[in-house]
Amino acid sequence: MEWASGKPGRGRQGQPVPWELRLGLLLSVLAATLAQVPSLDVPGCSRGSCYPATGDLLVGRADRLTASSTCGLHSPQPYCIVSHLQDEKKCFLCDSRRPFSARDNPNSHRIQNVVTSFAPQRRTAWWQSENGVPMVTIQLDLEAEFHFTHLIMTFKTFRPAAMLVERSADFGRTWRVYRYFSYDCGADFPGIPLAPPRRWDDVVCESRYSEIEPSTEGEVIYRVLDPAIPIPDPYSSRIQNLLKITNLRVNLTRLHTLGDNLLDPRREIREKYYYALYELVIRGNCFCYGHASQCAPAPGAPAHAEGMVHGACICKHNTRGLNCEQCQDFYQDLPWHPAEDGHTHACRKCECNGHSHSCHFDMAVYLASGNVSGGVCDGCQHNTAGRHCELCRPFFYRDPTKDMRDPAACRPCDCDPMGSQDGGRCDSHDDPVLGLVSGQCRCKEHVVGTRCQQCRDGFFGLSASNPRGCQRCQCNSRGTVPGGTPCDSSSGTCFCKRLVTGDGCDRCLPGHWGLSHDLLGCRPCDCDVGGALDPQCDEATGQCPCRPHMIGRRCEQVQPGYFRPFLDHLTWEAEGAHGQVLEVVERLVTNRETPSWTGVGFVRLREGQEVEFLVTSLPRAMDYDLLLRWEPQVPEQWAELELVVQRPGPVSAHSPCGHVLPRDDRIQGMLHPNTRVLVFPRPVCLEPGLSYKLKLKLTGTGGRAHPETPYSGSGILIDSLVLQPHVLMLEMFSGGDAAALERRTTFERYRCHEEGLMPSKTPLSEACVPLLISASSLVYNGALPCQCDPQGSLSSECNPHGGQCRCKPGVVGRRCDACATGYYGFGPAGCQACQCSPDGALSALCEGTSGQCLCRTGAFGLRCDHCQRGQWGFPNCRPCVCNGRADECDAHTGACLGCRDYTGGEHCERCIAGFHGDPRLPYGGQCRPCPCPEGPGSQRHFATSCHRDGYSQQIVCHCRAGYTGLRCEACAPGHFGDPSKPGGRCQLCECSGNIDPTDPGACDPHTGQCLRCLHHTEGPHCGHCKPGFHGQAARQSCHRCTCNLLGTDPQRCPSTDLCHCDPSTGQCPCLPHVQGLSCDRCAPNFWNFTSGRGCQPCACHPSRARGPTCNEFTGQCHCHAGFGGRTCSECQELHWGDPGLQCRACDCDPRGIDKPQCHRSTGHCSCRPGVSGVRCDQCARGFSGVFPACHPCHACFGDWDRVVQDLAARTRRLEQWAQELQQTGVLGAFESSFLNLQGKLGMVQAIVAARNTSAASTAKLVEATEGLRHEIGKTTERLTQLEAELTDVQDENFNANHALSGLERDGLALNLTLRQLDQHLDILKHSNFLGAYDSIRHAHSQSTEAERRANASTFAIPSPVSNSADTRRRAEVLMGAQRENFNRQHLANQQALGRLSTHTHTLSLTGVNELVCGAPGDAPCATSPCGGAGCRDEDGQPRCGGLGCSGAAATADLALGRARHTQAELQRALVEGGGILSRVSETRRQAEEAQQRAQAALDKANASRGQVEQANQELRELIQNVKDFLSQEGADPDSIEMVATRVLDISIPASPEQIQRLASEIAERVRSLADVDTILAHTMGDVRRAEQLLQDAQRARSRAEGERQKAETVQAALEEAQRAQGAAQGAIRGAVVDTKNTEQTLQQVQERMAGTEQSLNSASERARQLHALLEALKLKRAGNSLAASTAEETAGSAQSRAREAEKQLREQVGDQYQTVRALAERKAEGVLAAQARAEQLRDEARGLLQAAQDKLQRLQELEGTYEENERELEVKAAQLDGLEARMRSVLQAINLQVQIYNTCQ
């Protein structure tokens, strides 16, 4: 606020208004400034607080002013005066018994006389207390609360020596002190703080109004609010309480006297001392809390007193009360609050919508409303309620069509009291959030309706006594009809769904279950007709009663561990039947076909033979259909059979089969051609618990294989006899209901009975499965147990359909309880395959327990698969050939095993190593030990083998590695030891491969110490690199340490040629914070690598920099916007200040600065010489002219300026000394002397203080006194002498200053020279010559140091006070020494700069340019063919190198071009490979299409065959039906005639010619299937070639990728030479892998071809069987022979085709491989050349970089480094050639092994 801060405000007319007046306007405190400030118009009360005018509160209230003591109040009282002594009369009489009257009673001095009056002789009246009374009280009692601002008391006598002012705001009940006044505050009011007050409410004691002067008309003034103290909140309650008063009291506590009353107690003396007060002014105003601008007389106060400040406020802002301290009656919506400036805090009217005229304020309501409204209306009318009468009373509601202020806004509710809540109460108003609708009745829980007059749906019986209104319908909701009321609203009767019953609709009808919300209420039980015992189910769960081991709600599922038997479950195998001389034909099962038989195989039944089946364990008495499974021997074979059922006894008439006649047990059957199952014409009735014998007899058979070849007859093959229950006779099919008829129709339509015809089960229609399950449950009374054999099955559970268990390998049977044909050894692991050798065994079957195969002559073993001991060459076994020195040989190769007598070889035909001789000779061929020098087994045998020389007949030893000599008796070069001693041997010298193995002196022959280490190694084993080298000595890879001198520790790297790095890794010893193998770069977040002392931290500001990194050369951090400086901790460029607070732009005159950046902390501009000023915009001291043309002043200015500056300095020092003397006294520099004198004076005092003073003490005192006087004299003389010396020193100092002025001018000139040199250094600093830069920097540091010393010498000022007389001499010596040193340093700097300039001019780039660009570069760029440094082409790009230039740049460009060319070649090879891959894919696609066409032809033939068979079957069934019809007894002639007519009407859909032609086409198609072999053989060849081409393309692509990587390596020029060797080794490994892949592919091709051949042969065999023109089958032996010959032919054909495919594949693979290999070799040669060139470039680049860092001194060493690298590359090339030769030998060996494998040689 302005008045609190001391800022002047302005009034209405704009005049300056002091803060006192503003405070008066705000707080009614105008008295303090009333005398100084004229009255202003007080603003109205409409915009804020308003206050009444301020005046004297005593006016009109004289009767309310009292005093505790008044003179002459009871009788006249004399008094005297002490002032106006010139007057004759000194004593007077006081008579205050009557009021004062100037004419009648002028001696009355009552307290009412102090009220201000403006009479001309107002000093004639005053108040006076009684004589000598010190404690007097003056008190004003006001009729109301007032604001009190200040008081003024004017005394006629002395002002009181002590007094205090008090106030009361509660009409005198409590008092508080305003201020204490006292001449002696400590004595009168102890503990009260002294004035001035620090805070506006401090109670202090003030002394300035209690002085004894003046003796009359002295004033005491007190202001409540001190204008010098700021007030934070003028509207605070503490300020208001401080100003508010109802009573004011002044306590006078002590009189001022002249002191005579203390010595003379007479009454006359006391008559002079009393209190007399001319005037008392108490300023204030009516206290209205800012709610009134005027006041009226209070009750009982005079109404027309002129100038009276009345006490009753004329309230505004809707307030009332004497002080406006309350709100008006109907304005209680807000809490009462004093008005404030800018806020009236007016009381707000209550909102009662016209329904009330009174209200009250409720603070709780106000707080709950968020301090918005607190008024509560009282006595709401018109049926309203609420705080604002805004609601309707209970049982009334708000009419939405009328305004709330309408008296008829609330209407009575219209609700049925029986069905509504609260006796008919409705919603009083609308509220969408709460769901209230005005006038809406609130019904009971079970009542609805606009008036709540009816029951809710589902309830009935409306009653007023029911708290919920209605009763709930006792109906089950699930069984009740939906969509309406569930019961009658009056009676409660329930409405049930169609399938629901019960009083409450809570039960299902019989045969139904699951009461639910469905449309019908319940669901049918739908129990399975066969799996359930009863059609009724559980009403709650729907569970039907199941037969044994049937589960599911409907009993339609089989329990786990049980199964539903197939219709052919009752099967009896022919192999287990009885008969005379029955021949069992076993049949092997292949993995590629589904068996068409059951059991082991078949029984051959010849004409006239009989087989007997024993039938037991039947499940049910019923009719069973008889099925006979058989297999014809020729395609058109037929047979006639007779089946006789032999019962155990006569059939009882009461049994289920009582209707059976004896002739019914003899049944004739006919086996038709091309059928596999015979269904006998009629079923037989059998009963459980009985044993039946069914005898089957073959009565006749016939057929032919060719029209010209009659059938010779070989019987038929019988598989099994099946008793299939005739399920159609079951009640589920034969019942007369609609469900039974539908089940029968479905069973017949989908031919569900065909499940039991064939052993192989095809998927049935989904409609058959539930019917078969039900029928099976009826026949077998539920499900049957699996009974899986625990040894032969994988699980105890079986297939629920049919009961087939999961068998282990080689195990068959439903229960997995027997070995399959061709397997043996039934046990926990299943059965093992016989695996009889087809070459050595007579049959593929073996004995079922032991697995022994039936061997041919000469074969041996369990599987007849090898020769006997001493023979080989299975199956053509022959004796072993071992020269009598072995008993066994290899069964396949014939190589002898376990040769004796030191022999070896395949036939024991040679001696083993270490022996010699010829064991093939019958005599004298023994193997003898080699004498090298002793034989094997001794400790001195050092040869691998030996032989006898044919010419000299001497034994020649083949020494082991490390030995030499005729008998291997000496150590070879590179080895050491003494083999001549027993146990001695030669050992390889452990030299880590770093010696010449052919050098005899490479190592010591006795100790093995290495003597001639190679490859920069040393040590006793050449196992360490020499000092200055690093690497792995064992790998011959010691390289010279390449350390950057700038980043390397100089103690570990004194020179470039001798740097001690880590011998293993080559890591150089880096300076602090330097990284890199060569110490050539700073660590992250460090910079200044070129300092030679390590790198410095970036120290980037953590928040003002973008990151911790900086420029590695300049150290500049990457700053955020708005920040600058090296570390981003300063303001940005051309700014200054604290970046954390504010940055300001540099305000510098660009004409007067030497750099644009000002001082970053102070903003001072950096002025050029001769310029000064804050902005560098004026001439400096010592310069004249008009800026910017500033010129140095005359030379005399410097002398006079020095004198002036010296005088100014002396003046400042003298001023400082004066301040020190003022603070510390006169001691100063003579403090020690004064302390000495003080000590002696102390001794004198001690002597004087002594009681017993002796003569000696007195003499000692006199002596001390004389000593003191002498010391004082000497000190005075010393001071005089020092003052004279000081004058001399000042004179000499002036002369020295004059000399220093000249020296300063010289220093300025030197600074100018140094700046010029600094500019030259900046120019040289941007060059790339580090050595020159270091020298210049060193010189610059020396120059800087010299400048610093010169400046120190120039500006040093000696102190004349602290130094003695020799200061001048030392100053002259110091200046002389500095001048000589400066001259010497300056001369040295000039000489160094001269040398540096000369050296800089001699530096040439021609050598470097020639090495890099190929030309010296001394010619102009326009004529230079190779360019160079600074040359650019037409496009502005740097030009270096070109055609005919042999520099490093040209060489690198050439290598880059070659690499790109290589990359293009590789890309082209990849494109070609992609083409090959596409052709391979096309070939494979064509092969697959051919195979698909062949398969389609085969499928079509099979389909045609199936159609023919189906037609035949239908024809046979038709004939059989006709026969059955004709044989029936009830057939009448008309029916027979009708059937005959229909039979005759049947027409064949084709003529005999069409049938013949169709048969010919089928035969032709079948014959054409023979070409499938050729087609697929060619196709397989194409596939193999395609796969081989694909593999070749993939290998070529992989190698191309390898070459591409190598090309990228060359292009980058960063890989090592060893990568070439690694790539070559990888190529060799790739070739080996490719060869192995080729071998595996060949094997896979052969396997696939063999499988395809077998499949085609099988297809051809089946086609020949189907062909009508095939030859008839021969006898079994002839058939077996034919099959064997056919197999041999097939094997031979397959072998020939394999050889042909192998030949073609080898030719193609060989050609492709040679092509790829040649291409890879060419690419490898190019890559090796490019790598060698890249290695050369890298070494040259390293040499150039190192030469530049070492001041171009190592250019001579590049040639040596190049030659060394050339030699190393030659070694690597030789190693690579050796690896390539090794690769070729490995490939040859692999090819040889492949050939051997393919030819089986």
UniProtKB/Swiss-Prot annotation:
InterPro entries: EGF-like_dom (IPR000742), LAMB1-4_helical (IPR056558), Laminin/Netrin_ECM (IPR050440), Laminin_IV_B (IPR013015), Laminin_N (IPR008211), LE_dom (IPR002049), LMN_ATRN_NET-like_EGF (IPR056863)
Residue pairs linked by disulfide bridges in the UniProt entry: 286-295, 288-313, 315-324, 327-347, 350-359, 352-377, 380-389, 392-410, 413-426, 415-441, 443-452, 455-470, 473-487, 475-494, 496-505, 508-522, 525-537, 527-544, 546-555, 786-798, 788-805, 807-816, 819-831, 834-846, 836-853, 855-864, 867-877, 880-889, 882-896, 899-908, 911-927, 930-946, 932-957, 959-968, 971-986, 989-1003, 991-1010, 1013-1022, 1025-1038, 1041-1061, 1043-1068, 1070-1079, 1082-1095, 1098-1110, 1100-1117, 1119-1128, 1131-1143, 1146-1158, 1148-1165, 1167-1176, 1179-1190
Residue positions where Phosphoserine is found in the record: 1535
Region of interest: Domain alpha: 1413-1445
Tissues where this protein is expressed: Found in the basement membranes (major component). S-laminin is concentrated in the synaptic cleft of the neuromuscular junction.
Residue ranges the record marks as coiled coil: 1259-1306, 1475-1529, 1576-1793
A single MF term (Gene Ontology): structural constituent of synapse-associated extracellular matrix
GO terms under cellular component: basement membrane; laminin complex; laminin-3 complex; neuromuscular junction; synapse; synaptic cleft
Alphabetically ordered keywords of this record: Basement membrane, Cell adhesion, Coiled coil, Disulfide bond, Extracellular matrix, Glycoprotein, Laminin EGF-like domain, Phosphoprotein, Repeat, Secreted, Signal
Signal peptide positions on this chain: 1-35
Region (Domain II): 1193-1412
Listed CDD domains: cc_LAMB2_C, EGF_Lam
PANTHER family according to UniProt: LAMININ SUBUNIT BETA-2 (PTHR10574:SF36), NETRIN/LAMININ-RELATED (PTHR10574)
Domain notes from UniProt: The alpha-helical domains I and II are thought to interact with other laminin chains to form a coiled coil structure.
Biological role: Binding to cells via a high affinity receptor, laminin is thought to mediate the attachment, migration and organization of cells into tissues during embryonic development by interacting with other extracellular matrix components.
Protein name: Laminin subunit beta-2
